[in-house]
UniProtKB/Swiss-Prot annotation:
Pfam families: DapH_N, Hexapep, Hexapep_2
Family, per entry: Belongs to the transferase hexapeptide repeat family. DapH subfamily.
TM spans (from-to): none
Top-rank lineage group of the source organism: Bacteria
Keyword set includes rRNA-binding: no
Pathway, per record: Amino-acid biosynthesis; L-lysine biosynthesis via DAP pathway; LL-2,6-diaminopimelate from (S)-tetrahydrodipicolinate (acetylase route): step 1/3
Protein name: 2,3,4,5-tetrahydropyridine-2,6-dicarboxylate N-acetyltransferase
Amino acid sequence: MNTQEIINLIANSKKKTLTVAYLTGNLKNIDFKSFEFFGTENFGILFGEYEEIVKLIENNKEHIEKYKLEIKARNSAIPLANLAKYNARIEPGAIIRDLVEIGDGAVIMMGAVINIGAKIGEGTMIDMNAVVGGRAIIGKNCHIGAGAVIAGVIEPPSAQPVIIEDNVMVGANAVILEGVRIGQNSVIAAGAVVIEDVPPNSVVAGVPAKIIKKVDEKTKQKTQIVEGLRKLR
């Protein structure tokens, strides 16, 4: 999907306020047919839209003794991804929206956020609290360090997403701006702000990031990925 297609999808989608209700009381006389309901005559868990659940509770006050509502999202346009479809290691607390592609053996750590339309290559690790923006493309066997930001192109809209080629190491808290392409085997130093394309096999650092050298054997030893962290079984 291109940027405008994603914008149109978000703009035209039916917004949802997903809510979970916990109910106690005399529930056998309440009609739950239009909801997902799990429970007994005295206790139940209800899944549905906030306004519809509130209306049901108001209309059945005489049957409900206590209730508690948990609102999972408010006017949400895009659901979270179904994690079961990925052959990857995804740790608790990662937030992945729908329409995200994740390659086999990838690792998504706690607190990572991956927005709609992003593509993560095989064996790539998205470390803790890193943000991968909409439509960003990350190749195979990369490491996106903790707190790094890979800019998205949904707002402000941009035709060209960030592209990170294979075997790239992005240090903690680095920022890659919209439309930038990082060549394969490159290393982005921690805290760098990358505002222009980086040739393959380059090491960049600073704000704004500048090429400081080519990748050498010493650099490779310091930035190698650990295959054992990508094992699923």
